[in-house]
Amino acid sequence: MSRLSTIFTQLPVGKKVFIPFITAGDSGLDNTFELMQVLVKNGADVIELGVPFSDPIADGPIIAKSHERAVADGVGLCDVLSLVKKFRQSNDTTAIVLMGYLNPIEAFGYQAFANAASESAVDGVLVVDMPPEEAHDLKRSLDDVNIDLIFLVALTTTDERLAFLATIASGFIYFISLKGVTGAEHLDVDLVKMYLLRVRKMINLPIGVGFGIKNAKSAKAVSKYADAVIVGSLLVAFVEQYANDRNKMLANVGYFADEISTAIK
């Protein structure tokens, strides 16, 4: 059983998986490593690491700027894999999902990337700009090394697309609870509930809900219907706000992570 499967299946009834997102290398790779430790201490079950990219079209302003800062510091895919390998020296229970764009993976080569990700003990990969219909080659390479290929589902996703995702997705489904980019507003929990029922009829995987979760109240509301709660923009905002004060950065990220985790467990 994969690390992701273990996390989702062994959680006590009524408790939900907490998945925080941070961009690798934003404020420095050493800081990212410390942030990962803090997130684990404050309830993270899975950590999504953003792989820096020069044109993060699916991300809102907060996360897009974090990509810009990390790219400006020269952080790339190889650095992220090295970071995960370092993390694994002291943690073999928290799952790590790489979330990024297709170009760096294509440049690396699908099989070479899959092998390197496996060597670093990455658990899942989410490529935000790869259409599922074009994912077979990457899927095959990741399957060879038992790494899950995770896909996004939106309010606008058709039944036809959901049926196809049921044949190719693994790990969990990342449900975008809003129309727009990361960091958007106006979370409609009733709409999320209704759509998740539709997704569950077609895809037999855990569902994590992201976008629009701003506090413990919204996290708790979503967790009634989701298997996991995903939070990113607010954590990344703390990294930017306290870029020159590491202790405050770690403290604020830790406090917020604990608040969300406590609300859903």
Curated annotation (Swiss-Prot):
Pathway: Amino-acid biosynthesis; L-tryptophan biosynthesis; L-tryptophan from chorismate: step 5/5
Entry GO MF terms: tryptophan synthase activity
InterPro entries hit by this protein: Aldolase_TIM, RibuloseP-bd_barrel, Trp_synthase_alpha_AS, Trp_synthase_suA
Transmembrane segments: none
Catalytic activity: (1S,2R)-1-C-(indol-3-yl)glycerol 3-phosphate + L-serine = D-glyceraldehyde 3-phosphate + L-tryptophan + H2O
Pfam (any one): Trp_syntA
Active site: residue positions: 48 (proton acceptor), 59 (proton acceptor)
Keyword Amino-acid biosynthesis tagged: yes
Keywords for this protein: Amino-acid biosynthesis, Aromatic amino acid biosynthesis, Lyase, Tryptophan biosynthesis
Enzyme Commission number(s) from the entry: 4.2.1.20
Class of the enzyme per the UniProt entry, highest EC level: lyase
Gene Ontology CC: cytosol
The keyword Amino-acid biosynthesis belongs to this UniProt entry's keyword annotation: yes
Family: Belongs to the TrpA family.
Function: The alpha subunit is responsible for the aldol cleavage of indoleglycerol phosphate to indole and glyceraldehyde 3-phosphate.
Assembly behavior: Tetramer of two alpha and two beta chains.
The protein, known as: Tryptophan synthase alpha chain
Organism from which the protein derives: Ruthia magnifica subsp. Calyptogena magnifica
